[in-house]
Amino acid sequence: MRTEYCGQLNLSHVGQQVTLCGWVNRRRDLGSLIFIDMRDREGIVQVFFDPDRADAFSLASELRNEFCIQITGTVRARDEKNVNRDMATGEVEVFATELTIINRAEPLPLDSNQVNSEEARLKYRYLDLRRPEMAQRLKTRAKITSFVRRFMDDHGFLDIETPMLTKATPEGARDYLVPSRVHKGKFYALPQSPQLFKQLLMMSGFDRYYQIVKCFRDEDLRADRQPEFTQIDVETSFMTAPQVREVMEKLIRQLWLDVKGVDLGEFPVMTFAEAERRYGSDKPDLRNPMELVDVADLLKSVEFAVFAGPANDPKGRVAALRVPGGAQLSRKQIDDYGNFVKIYGAKGLAYIKVNERAKGLDGINSPVAKFLNAEIVEAILERTGAQDGDMIFFGADHKKVVADALGALRLKLGKDLSLTDEAKWAPLWVIDFPMFEDDGEGGLSAMHHPFTAPKDMTAEELKAAPEDAVANAYDMVINGYEVGGGSVRIHRGEMQQTVFGILGINEHEQREKFGFLLDALKFGTPPHAGLAFGLDRLTMLLTGTDNIRDVIAFPKTTAAACLMTEAPSFANPTALAELGIEVVKKASPENK
């Protein structure tokens, strides 16, 4: 039906007769001529109709936005004064001699001339996806997956599918359950990841596996989360953590070159402890120059319990955050930031405004200055590198509260004061995570997942001091986003059972939930390691959007609903009966 795409026409096509198919993006009737911008997935080209071609001109007068049409015409070069530098096809136009209206469009529920609500965009997603910027994002996503497949094939990885209907295993979030008709009362689970299957593939001898795979998690959604998402899933045998990182870093560096024409350079490597200490985050945005600086040793003897308490507590921390140019902040802005850090458990936000450092106490403005002598103030200014016009904010509390609060404040200030270099790319690896964390109920939970191996520990040593264990895990972070994470896996049964025991999973439960894995570990399991990238998040970064729904063709809302298809929906009672399921309605208060 077509000979060319609209968006690919250029001066090399001048004089050629072409047939185009697409949609009317805009129509302009000048009386003697009718112009339309015609759009397809590759872009937009200007088409015009002349009264001398009476049939085509008459039909063109009926055109409205989003009519689906076919035109045949001749490509012409535009006069220099009419060249549109803002269009890829702006040097040419098409003189249409034939027009076919393939399908008319009713008045549109979306207005291309204004910002539509996200609810409307999701309800009429098929119209929203016609917008060039949305089409471009999905084309970029397709380019990413195509590149990944070529790279993995070239590096000896096998694309192997794993089951979508599997067994529920504890991986941190709730499972989506699928009832079995054949085995009434039993349920499959949709996979939160192919984690155990890819480990079993290594035990099967496949050595290098990858898969671009859907995963499912029934969890409370955030703006950057979806109930179903896509991973680039990778697993290898007989490779160390540094070797896995080397191959995966090569993949991402070459991907950025291919898609963006940008060389990310060699990725720095930072431990979890250093990232938390310097940036208050295990996924630091290195485009932001601000760092947290420990000052507890300077404040142990001050007569100010807010500082002295955490400074003398082994579990406490006092840290300072220097904000270049921050002295310009108003009292209201400071109060707003004080309320902001309370979200993360902080009780407030002490500060020092540095007006003229050379004047000592007389050159600063601070509500806590009365508790500090000139020597302490100068030591703080020296350690933080403060200059005239800077602001220093303080966090004083439990270590985690200080890291979370000042880490979040650092990001917010970086954005609010334009301190973060938005034009920069800042990748890194974060390694050496704690293996376990407090579960809030007196026990421990796995910081990553229960199949991650500890670093340089025997099973006996791990059992004796699990709180000291460092996971042989690694996360790839770009511009403050965790784009991928992985680890060396446990490949010995004794170690796996020890980890399960530390997590409070007794032997009976281990056999019930993971018997197949424990059995497989008895038969010559190779050392193996892997990683998974979030395809959605990679696409967000490479397309410059901060909304994950912009890079998924048919996403869900934050309430895990599809406004277009109205999923989820009530099931047919007959289908439920076949599954042995009865919907129990909540009793009203008066009937209780």
UniProtKB/Swiss-Prot annotation:
Transmembrane segments: none annotated. Keywords: Aminoacyl-tRNA synthetase, ATP-binding, Cytoplasm, Ligase, Nucleotide-binding, Protein biosynthesis. It is found in: Cytoplasm. ATP binds at R217, D218, E219, Q226, E482, G534, L535, D536, R537. One of its GO terms (biological process) is aspartyl-tRNA aminoacylation. GO terms for cellular component: cytoplasm. One of its GO terms (molecular function) is aspartate-tRNA ligase activity. It is an enzyme of class 6 (ligase). Its main location: cytoplasm. Its EC number is 6.1.1.12. Residues 195-198 are annotated as: Aspartate. It catalyses: tRNA(Asp) + L-aspartate + ATP = L-aspartyl-tRNA(Asp) + AMP + diphosphate. Pfam families: GAD, tRNA-synt_2, tRNA_anti-codon. L-aspartate binds at E171, R217, H448, R489. SUPFAM superfamilies: Class II aaRS and biotin synthetases, GAD domain-like, Nucleic acid-binding proteins. HAMAP family: Asp_tRNA_synth_type1 (MF_00044). Catalyzes the attachment of L-aspartate to tRNA(Asp) in a two-step reaction: L-aspartate is first activated by ATP to form Asp-AMP and then transferred to the acceptor end of tRNA(Asp). Homodimer. Belongs to the class-II aminoacyl-tRNA synthetase family. Type 1 subfamily. NCBIfam families: aspS_bact (TIGR00459), PRK00476.1 (NF001750). This is Aspartate--tRNA ligase. The gene is aspS.
